[in-house]
């Protein structure tokens, strides 16, 4: 049952992203898509954290921080891009964020291509 609820959540997020991409198309900076996605998430009442900072540790020493674009309903990490094409480094970044934030599922959403590109990410154990 939990998987079904989670799928409903990811479909809602993807639906919001599709609305933004259908309205704006590609060619804008990532921050523009972030701001528009906020508007769409607010319209449907999804709770989210934006640009939530997380410390990164190595050998129990903090070596830096990272910021995920969105954490939605404390269940789905969403990383946005505005690139012509997603590369392996973007997938690796999303997977690393899932580990750092200890979140099981994520979405990598690329607004930069002619068609919206969405990759589902799952944390490795």
State where each predicted segment sits.
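Nucleic-acid endonuclease domains
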Residues: 28, 42-43, 62, 91-94, ...
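A short acidic/basic microdomain associated with nuclease active sites
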Residues: 44-60
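Well-ordered beta-strand positions
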Residues: 49, 69-71, 110
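Well-ordered beta-strand scaffold positions
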Residues: 46, 61, 75-76, 114
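Nucleic-acid nuclease catalytic cores
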Residues: 81-125
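Conserved catalytic cores of phosphodiester-cleaving nucleases, focusing on short active-site segments
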Residues: 25, 68-86, 97
């Amino acid at each position: 049952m939990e998987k079904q609820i989670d799928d409903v959540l990811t479909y809602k997020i993807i639906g919001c992203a599709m609305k933004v991409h259908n309205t704006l198309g590609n060619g804008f900076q990532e921050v523009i898509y972030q701001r528009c996605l906020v508007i769409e998430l607010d319209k449907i009442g999804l709770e989210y954290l934006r640009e939530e900072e997380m410390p990164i540790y190595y050998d129990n020493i903090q070596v830096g921080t990272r910021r995920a674009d969105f954490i939605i309903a404390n269940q789905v990490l969403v990383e946005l891009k505005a690139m012509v094409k997603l590369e392996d480094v973007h997938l690796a970044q999303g997977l690393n964020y899932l580990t750092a934030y200890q979140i099981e599922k994520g979405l990598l959403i690329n607004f930069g291509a002619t068609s919206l590109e969405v990759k589902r990410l799952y944390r490795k154990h």
